[in-house]
Amino acid sequence: MLAMSISYRGSRALYRGTPYLGVDSQRLQQLHTAAKIKLLGITLPPPGGPKANYNIVCWESPTTLYMSGHLPIRVDGSLVTGSIGPGGLTLEQGQEAARWCGLNLIATLQDQLGGDLDRVEKVVKLFGIVSSKQEFKQQHLVLNGCSDVMMAVFEDRGYHARSAIGTNTLPLDAAVEVEALVKIKAPFTR
């Protein structure tokens, strides 16, 4: 079970104008990203490695991170599996899986950036693949789980373009897989 529930539905006014989990939004905006994660009650899973014959989960150019697909792996290492739709996982369970994908992406970002998530300048794009029953047509709503996490953690830097598609199966029977394109700031040097 995720340590928090995000009800952030893409409304900047909701985030800026109201307390979030009892925390004043003005205070949240002034915090470093790592402190914000802690304040929001988020526990990141350990960063994962490749699940097949490739050796990087994230490729870094001077200002961009190209992130391989991340699966919904919980803090305890278990994987959210199954297809979403009639006779399978519910929309809400799919969104929870997408949240775990988002948390895994953030864990990889933190690892890749030496712990400095403030180097994230912009989450540019998410691409989500949803394991779906043929009758299920709400893949875009499943991906809200990942988008909500990005926007809660990175605020305006977390707003992104996004694509969502459905497929009949994913590697390891994962429910969702999400990859990301992230713009980063150069590391601080003296």
Region roles according to the model:
Residues 2-127, 132-190:
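N-terminal presequence-like segments and the immediate start of the first folded domain
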